[in-house]
């Protein structure tokens, strides 16, 4: 990981988005060809184009990645793609060392995961994911920040776990995670918190 705090924070934030609403894909083609692809999907064109793409471009420039960002419109979602072996392994290696993230990286990752998988209603603050072990890591980080939470299997979503922020600690979550100066959320994704 680079020493630059902006690079590590933005990288952790983007990794949260990738894990929540995207993926790291190694695609195999005929003729023994392969493609390494980093993907983030979102319903909001504005979020992809005005917020996520500039952050990804910053990281691409910092890492001297030669690949270009592609934004593909699907039926219901927009997909940001970068075909790059270097960027693929950069994020894959980050994911392997997630337990070693410093506090800044933890906050940035949680913020990205929340933008991707979080419930933005005023009644509850929740993050969904199929990977219970990942949510347990996030839960520990939040507990260390003084934000109480619980994890359980969501009965309405088969095989998906939900991390619930305690009612008492919603404001602390908003101030600690969502209002951090790193990568401020666009108003449309802040659930009324800006």
Swiss-Prot record:
Segments forming domain DOD-type homing endonuclease: 14-147
Any one GO molecular function term: endonuclease activity
Active site: 21, 117
Short name of one Pfam family: LAGLIDADG_3
Cofactor binding note: Mn(2+), Co(2+) and Mg(2+) enable equal cleavage, Zn(2+) is less active and Ni(2+) is essentially inactive.
Gene3D superfamilies: Homing endonucleases (3.10.28.10)
Keyword Nuclease: yes
Function: Endonuclease involved in intron homing. Has a slow turnover rate, cuts the coding strand with a slight preference over the non-coding strand.
Name the record gives this protein: Homing endonuclease I-DmoI
